[in-house]
UniProtKB/Swiss-Prot annotation:
GTP binds at residues 202-209, 248-252, 302-305. NCBIfam families: IF-2 (TIGR00487), small_GTP (TIGR00231). GO terms for cellular component: cytosol. Residues 302-305 are annotated as: G4. Residues 248-251 are annotated as: G3. Transmembrane segments: none annotated. It is found in: Cytoplasm. One of the essential components for the initiation of protein synthesis. Protects formylmethionyl-tRNA from spontaneous hydrolysis and promotes its binding to the 30S ribosomal subunits. Also involved in the hydrolysis of GTP during the formation of the 70S ribosomal complex. Residues 202-209 are annotated as: G1. Residues 193-362 form the tr-type G domain. Keywords: Cytoplasm, GTP-binding, Initiation factor, Nucleotide-binding, Protein biosynthesis. It comes from the Bacteria. This is Translation initiation factor IF-2.
Length: 691
C-alpha cells in the first residue's frame, strides 16, 4: 500500500503544511509534522471533505493562511523582542528574527533522493553526500555486515537515508533486463501461422515411445525411405504440408519442472492410455499436471490391436476424471491408435492439426528470436550445447544470445535430423553451439544487440539470482497460512494428497475441499496412492501447494527436494487430525507443539529369531544414526506398517547407545515381531518447537 507525506498532500490541496496538520488533528488523524505519512484511506477522506467546498476553498484557505502567517510573524517578533529586551539590546532582536527565518527556511527545504531496489553503500553515500564509513557503522549497528562496494536493498537504504533527514523515493525505471524480457506486442499483420509444439505423456509401458517412433517412421517412410537418427530432444513431422513439432522430453516430471521455472512451451498435450490397462496412477498424475498448466489435451487410446483392448472402459474412466469424450457429449478428443500396427496414426496427426487450428497459433518471424531451452549438456568437442525451441522471431548464425545467467554467440545450429542450418524460425527445434556455460532447461533465450551487452546482462542476472536466493519466495505452509490469508496473499490453497489406500485419498479429498470458505478456496490438485515422490514435490512447487501424507512417507530424494524448493510436507495417521489442522490454520489457531527430527534410516538385511525375546532385525545403517532410545517406524514398500520404540540395540553381542551410518547392528522393536527383510527402519525424535 502506498503512503503519502503530509507536505505532498498539502501541496496538492494548495494548503500550508501547518493548516493541513491542524485539520488532520481535528479529524482525529494524528500526525507529528510535515514529514509524517498518511494511508490511502486517510488521503481519500481528506480529499472528499475538502472537495465539498469547491468555490470558496481556495480563497478561504488563502485568507486563513495569510491571517495565520501574519499572527505567527507578530508573535515571533514579540517573542524575539522580549528576549532581546531582557538581554538589553536591539541587536539581539534583529539576530533572533534572522534565526527564526533561517529555521523556517530549513523546514521548507525538504531533501529528496531517488534510489533503486538495490545499490551499493558507496552509491548511497554519494547521493546523500556523506562519508560511506558513517553508513557502514549504522548498518553494522543494525546487524548488517557490509563493505563499501556491497549492495544493500531499498528497505535498509531508505531507513539509513531517513536517519539523515532525507525523504526517499523508489526508482521505478525498469532496467535493461526487464525491458528485454518485456516483449513488445506484434502487429497483427506481421503474425504468421506456426507449427504446434506437442508433448506426449502417459503411464509407463503404455506406449509413449512407440507412438513417437510410429509417428516419425510414418513420416520418414513418406519422405526419405530409410532409418532416421534422432539428434536432439525434439522432432519435426510433416503432414499435408503442415509441420508438427514433438518434444521428446519424457514424462510429466520434465513438463512440470519446466513449468515451475516459468517455461510454458507446450501448445498441445497428447495423453497416451493403453486400451487394455486403462487409466493408471501415472495417467492421473499426468492429467493433473496438464490441468494445472491449462493446456489443450488429446487422448490417444493405444494398443487397440490387442484382444484384451477395451476403449469404452478407458473412456468411462476418463469421464470419471472430468475428461468426457466428444462422442459422449464432452470436449475431450479421443483417438484409438495402435503404434505397433500403425493404426490411427494419421487420424491422430489430423486431430493435432485441428486443435492447433482452433488455438490459432501464430508468431512473427521477422524479428530477433526468443525461445526456450529444453535440453542442455556439455559435449566433448562441442562445448556447451543446448536444444532450443524458437518461439518468436528467427534465430540466425552470429546472433548474440542471452539465456538465464549464460550468454554467447550462435556459432552453429543443427536441426532435428542433424543437418547444419543457418537460421531457425518460430516453432523450430535446433541444437545451438556457442554458449559460455551450460544453460538450464526452462531458461528463456533472447537475442540481444551484441555479445558484450549479453555478457553484462548475464552478470547482472547472476547478481540478482544471489539476491533473490536470499529473499527466496515464501511458499505457503500451514503454520503461516492464516497470516497470508489476512494479507490477502492466499486466495486459493492447493493441496496434494498421498495416502496408503485409494479410499483414504477420496475421503480426505472430500473432507478437505468442504473446508473452503469466502476467504480461501481449498483445491485438491492431485491425489494418489503411494509414497511421496520427487514428482509430487515438483508439482507442489510449481502450483504453490502443500503435500498431505496419510500413512505414507516421503522418499529420501523427495524430502531433500522439498527442503530445497521450500515445499511444506505434512504427515498424518488420523484423518481427523488433518481436518483439524487445516481448520485451525485457516482460523489462525494452529499451535505446532513438536517437530519431528529424523535421526537415521536402517535397512533390514536379515531377521533372527531369539528365544525369549522374539524377532531381531539384522540391519545396515543407510544414513544418519540409530539411537537406543529413539522412536521408530517400519516402512514397507513406502507405506508405514508400524510405529513404536527400539527395545534393544546391539553391535555384535554388546548393547550400544548408538550406531552410525555404514555400520551393521541388531535392532529389536517393542511389541512388534512381523519384521521382514527389505523393511526400512526410520529412527526419529520429537523436539518441542519454541513458540
Amino acid at each position: 500500500m502506498s503512503k503519502t507525506r503530509v507536505y505532498e498532500l498539502a501541496k496538492e490541496l494548495n494548503l500550508s503544511s501547518k493548516d493541513l496538520i491542524s485539520r488532520l488533528n481535528d479529524l482525529d488523524i494524528k500526525v507529528k509534522n510535515h514529514m509524517s505519512t498518511l494511508e490511502d484511506e486517510e488521503v481519500d477522506l481528506i480529499m472528499d471533505l475538502l472537495s465539498d467546498k469547491p468555490q470558496q476553498t481556495d480563497e478561504i484557505n488563502q485568507q486563513e493562511e495569510d491571517i495565520f502567517e501574519d499572527n505567527l510573524e507578530d508573535l515571533e517578533e514579540e517573542r524575539a523582542y522580549k528576549k532581546s529586551f531582557k538581554k538589553g539590546g536591539k541587536k539581539n532582536k534583529k539576530n533572533n528574527k534572522k534565526v527564526i527565518l533561517t529555521e523556517e527556511k530549513q523546514e521548507d527545504e525538504i531533501k529528496i533522493i531517488t534510489i533503486p531496489e538495490f545499490l551499493t553503500v558507496k552509491e548511497l553515500a554519494e547521493k546523500m553526500k556523506v562519508n560511506p564509513t558513517e553508513i557502514i557503522k549504522k548498518l553494522i549497528a543494525k546487524g548488517i555486515m557490509v563493505t563499501v562496494n556491497q549492495q544493500i536493498d531499498f528497505e535498509n537504504a531508505s531507513k539509513i537515508a531517513e536517519e539523515y533527514g532525507f525523504l526517499v523515493d523508489k526508482e521505478e525505471v525498469k532496467d535493461e533486463l526487464e525491458l528485454l524480457l518485456e516483449e513488445a506486442p506484434d502487429d497483427e499483420k506481421d503474425l504468421q501461422p506456426r507449427p504446434p509444439i506437442v508433448t506426449v505423456m502417459g503411464h509407463v509401458d503404455h506406449g509413449k515411445t512407440s507412438l513417437l517412433d510410429a509417428i516419425r517412421n510414418t513420416n520418414v517412410t513418406m519422405k526419405e525411405m530409410g532409418g532416421i537418427t534422432q539428434h536432439i530432444g525434439a522432432s519435426v513431422v510433416e503432414v499435408n504440408n503442415k509441420k508438427i513439432v514433438f518434444l521428446d522430453t519424457p514424462g510429466h516430471e520434465a513438463f512440470t519442472a519446466m513449468r515451475a521455472r516459468g517455461a510454458s512451451i507446450t501448445d498441445i498435450v497428447v495423453l497416451v492410455v493403453a486400451a487394455d490397462d486403462g487409466v493408471m496412477p501415472q495417467t492421473v498424475e499426468a492429467i493433473n499436471h496438464v490441468k494445472a498448466a491449462n493446456a489443450p489435451m488429446i487422448v490417444a487410446i493405444n494398443k487397440i490391436d490387442l484382444p484384451t483392448a477395451n476403449p469404452d472402459k478407458v473412456k468411462t474412466e476418463l469421464s470419471e476424471l472430468g475428461l468426457v469424450p466428444e462422442e459422449w457429449g464432452g470436449n475431450t478428443i479421443c483417438v484409438p491408435v495402435s503404434a505397433k500396427k500403425n493404426i490411427g496414426i494419421d487420424n491422430l496427426l489430423e486431430m493435432i492439426l485441428l486443435v492447433a487450428e482452433m488455438e490459432d497459433l501464430k508468431a512473427n518471424p521477422n524479428k530477433p528470436a526468443r525461445g526456450t531451452i529444453i535440453e542442455a549438456k556439455l559435449e566433448k568437442g562441442k562445448g556447451p550445447v543446448a536444444t532450443v525451441i524458437v518461439q518468436n522471431g528467427t534465430l540466425q548464425i552470429g546472433d548474440a544470445i542471452l539465456a538465464g545467467t549464460t550468454y554467447g554467440r550462435v556459432r552453429a545450429m543443427f536441426d532435428d535430423k542433424g543437418k547444419r542450418i543457418k537460421k531457425a524460425g518460430p516453432s523450430t527445434p535446433v541444437e545451438v553451439l556457442g554458449f559460455s556455460e551450460v544453460p538450464e532447461a526452462g531458461d528463456k533465450l533472447i537475442v540481444v544487440e551484441e555479445e558484450k551487452k549479453a555478457r553484462e546482462l548475464a552478470e547482472r542476472r547472476k547478481e540478482l539470482q544471489k539476491e533473490m536466493e536470499l529473499k527466496r519466495k515464501q511458499k505457503v505452509s500451514l503454520e503461516d497460512l492464516f497470516s497470508q490469508i489476512q494479507e490477502g496473499s492466499v486466495k486459493e490453497l492447493n493441496i496434494i494428497i498421498k495416502a496408503d489406500v485409494q479410499g483414504s485419498v477420496e475421503a480426505l479429498k472430500k473432507s478437505i475441499e468442504d473446508l473452503s470458505n469466502e476467504e480461501v478456496r481449498i483445491k485438491v490438485i492431485h491425489g494418489a496412492v503411494g509414497a511421496i515422490t520427487e514428482t509430487d514435490v515438483m508439482l507442489a512447487s510449481a502450483s504453490n501447494a502443500i503435500i498431505i501424507g496419510f500413512n505414507v512417507r516421503p522418499e529420501t530424494n523427495a524430502k531433500n527436494l522439498a527442503e530445497k524448493e521450500k515445499v511444506d510436507i505434512k504427515l498424518y495417521r488420523i484423518i481427523y487430525d488433518v481436518i483439524e489442522d487445516i481448520k485451525a490454520a485457516m482460523k489462525g489457531l494452529l499451535e505446532p507443539k513438536y517437530k519431528e527430527v529424523e535421526l537415521g534410516r536402517a535397512e533390514v538385511r536379515a531377521v533372527f529369531r531369539v528365544p525369549g525375546v522374539g524377532n531381531v532385525a539384522g540391519c545396515y545403517v543407510l544414513s544418519g544414526k540409530i539411537l537406543r532410545n529413539a522412536d521408530v517406524r517400519i516402512i514397507r514398500n513406502g507405506i508405514v506398517v508400524y510405529e513404536g520404540k527400539i527395545a534393544s540395540l546391539k553391535r555384535f553381542k554388546d548393547d550400544v547407545r548408538e550406531v552410525q551410518q555404514g555400520f551393521e547392528c541388531g535392532i529389536g522393536i517393542e511389541k512388534f515381531n512381523d519384521i521382514k527383510e527389505g523393511d526400512i527402519i526410520e529412527a526419529y525424535q520429537m523436539e518441542e518447537i519454541p513458540r
